[in-house]
Design a protein with these regions (language model features):
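Ubiquitin-like/PB1-type beta-grasp interaction modules and other compact soluble beta-rich domains
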Residues: 1-72
Length: 73
């Protein structure tokens, strides 16, 4: 299983703080899950605490983090 963790406003947007999903080949495949449909395209993505893109391969027990973009000055 893959553990998906949502941070900041994405917890409210997606309706969960943590979700477990079956293993799929890539992060992009994982993001096609209907429960993740509201996720904005500019979301920051990480796999096992390293920034990742949609082509990043996934494996059993990976942790995926979904974070809103950071802004400020």
């Amino acid at each position: 299983m893959i553990t998906v963790k949502c941070f900041a406003r994405y917890r409210t947007l997606l309706g969960f703080a943590e979700l477990r999903l079956p293993v799929v080949p890539t992060l992009g495949d994982l993001l096609t899950d209907p429960r993740l449909a509201p996720l904005p395209k500019d979301a920051l993505l990480a796999v096992n605490q390293s920034f990742a893109d949609r082509a990043t391969p996934l494996a059993d027990c990976d942790e995926v983090a979904l974070m809103p973009p950071v802004s400020g000055g």
